[in-house]
Amino acid sequence: MKKNRVVVVQCRLSSQRFPEKAIKKLGNKTVLEWVLNSMHKVPADRYFVATDEKSYPVINEICIKNDFECFSGSLEDVLKRFCDLLQNVDAKTVIRATADNPFLFYEAAIDSVEEFEKRNKGKNRCDYLTFTGLPHGSGVEIFSKEALLKAATETKEPYDHEHVGPALYNHRDKYICDFIPSPNRYNFPTLRTTIDTYSDYLRAISIVNYCKAQDEPYTTEQILEAFNSKNVKNPVVLVPSVIKGHGTGHLHRCLNAAINKTFFVFIPYDKTLEEADSIINDYFKMGLHENQIISQLPDETYNPIIVTDTFKLTKEQINQIGVNKFLVSLDEGSDFSEYCDYLVDIIPSFDLQRNPNVFDSSFIQLPKNIKNKNEKSKSIDSIKKILVCFGGEDPSGFTIPTVNVIEKVFPSAQIVAIMSNSQNLSINYAAGINVEFVKSIQNLREKLFEYDLVITHYGLTAFEAAYAGCGVILLPTTKLHKNLAKKYNFSYIETETPSVTSVLNAFNSKNFYPNLPINTESKSLSDFVDTLSNAKKILCPICGKKSEQPDYIISRNSTRTYRRCQICGMSYMSFSLEEDKIYKKEYFFEDYKKQYGKTYQEDFESIKQQGFRRINNIKSLCKIENKNVFDIGCAYGPFLSAISDSKAIPYGTDIAEDAVKYVRNELHYPACCTAFPEINITEQFGVSHFDVITMWYVIEHFTNLDSVLRKVNASLKKDGVFAFSTPSGEGISAKSNKDNFYLISPTDHYSVWEPSKAKSILKKYGFEVVKVVSTGHHPERFPCIKNSAKEISKKSLKWKIVEKYSKLFNLGDTVEFYCVKKRNCEN
């Protein structure tokens, strides 16, 4: 039955930002084909692609395959192109889509065209209609053919002629245009599905990688599910070294990780590693998709997680990869490691002047095929087969000189030598009969066990060969490699170039069969990187700024990185793999009991007594009788109870619903379950300003302290008191073992306050620190007691002296600050 509808998809190949985007491959189809498939779901009498004359030959082929007609017209005057097409089409309703939107909500298109036609029944009239609130790139426009043809004769505005729809909706004095809020099913205005840039294209690839290629277009729900997936939200880009002289191991490691997931691998056009293309082609045969190899990095509109495997980052590379969610580096040996949010060391290194977050040799893919222990022998005659392998490149040209010497030392052995692609394999080698030169050995790791001796340099092959049970001799190519060979007990050739004597010495070394300090448990690097993609990068909670130079690294551990802000001096968690904590009933019962041996409520009276001590400190600064005291993070109310007993008026807030219910229903104090600083205190309590505001072990839980401290200032009367407690970054635990202090620091503590820096930070927010109280004194944490050969009694003189020392020099592991508001906070 005739519907009086025509679908027109607008398309050109001359886009300046991303040329030929409509014919880029997306899964097994071009971007344009995704659009055409979606628009075929919208019932119509005819389906067109409106393109320009230059694009027509390429576009027409795609149209024929997808049951669309192709029309060519003006390149620049798109309105004229549409009108020229519509002049010869019998239809009333036009459904317009564009060819750079592969993830159209076709269900929304159907609903919108039906709504348009409903509004044109009888004497009603609508000239233009579109749904608002859809993802950018998932909507269509519906308009009247008659209205558009008329509007085109009435406007000379360049914008109207370039974009079609504005010819109607920019002239609402003449045309009825309806912008209708979309139904909730389609209303996701913050999402972006269009392809206008290369970064958009990478996002589209991620969507297809998640949803998988299929003949039918994706439903609205499939597209939305993809946007919530890790693939799309947290794109991972692996950046291997493809520089001549760095070998091929970095590239192999990244490609191997990418093939098991849907990570992108960045291979720049200006690569100098000659073997790169052939290696990548090998991985295509193993299942790597061509779309996973990218030639430019995404921008901030599709912020990637960058994982570098570059040997040594350069300043140029740091600038190139500067746009990222966070930066992870593998075996990084440069002076730029402070730029790295997370460091993973896999191959044992020598004397690096920094600690990684993780050192784990189990990420080395060890061979499954291993020599029988009985096959190991140390006589010259027992060495039947030798492999000489200096990586995919051999930049120093060691292969031929080494083979020359090896043949003299092991005259009856068969020698296989891997030569780089740049070397001539047809070389007329003098000795000939026992030597075979090959360009590469497929799946070398699983064939190493076939060799009695492997001669290589320090790197993955050395560890793999040792694990496979081969004898290993290293030829150090640098002083660093010689030091590494010594440190990790490899036999190595001591002379700069191999000689018969130096090879024999290495062969007779006790380290010919090395005993390596590596974890034989095999772990998947791709799985680990996938886990890392869930992590979050955190800026300084005070300044909230990303500086050109990275903040100084204080400590790294397997789940977190800590830095010191170069602007304000705050120590803060800058990277975390931990999930955000949810403060429910369990936090105050099971979790609290695990840490302190009793539940929070069982500890109520003890905490309340601490409250009285704190109140006395507050009283030294101001009177509190009949004054309003607001406790942020009040929990089950022990401090509120102490405030009430001290004849002040308590108010509380906490994000734990059970705790707030207890305070209201059992203690009968005003409290609300509202996050700070979002709370509106006037609405909640009818109070515009408080006399005292407190936070007891709460302030360290905020990721944005700037907004918190501004809100405290705004909620506090002039000369009011702000008091808070927090772990101290200058206590004995932090001073005696900094890395352990940060390791055992709770994973939801985002800032670490230090008394020496707190005054300047708080002054910025209008507070004067009047009193600092060092608390949490633990003599048992001092090395002189902790490391003592015998147990030290709490009653002993040594214990008492250490305790006095701790208090005298403010070495408590917690600290309390008592501040007075001196001025309003500056904007």
Predicted feature locations:
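Conserved core of the sugar-phosphate nucleotidyltransferase
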Residues: 61, 104-193, 199-210, 224-229
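A short glycine-rich, Lys/Arg-flanked "PGG" loop and its adjoining helix->strand segment in the class I
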Residues: 706-721
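Conserved N-terminal segment of class I S-adenosyl-L-methionine
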Residues: 534-688, 692-696, 706-709, 774, ...
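A C-terminal cap/extension of S-adenosyl-L-methionine-dependent methyltransferases
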Residues: 551, 771-827
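Conserved catalytic-core segment of nucleotide-activated headgroup transferases in glycan assembly
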Residues: 249-253, 375-423
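Short phosphate-binding loop-to-helix
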Residues: 53-117, 292-299, 312-313
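A nucleotide-sugar donor-handling region in carbohydrate enzymes
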Residues: 214, 219-221, 340-397
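Short, glycine-/aromatic-enriched active-site segment of Class I SAM-dependent methyltransferases
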Residues: 147, 724-751, 756-761, 777, ...
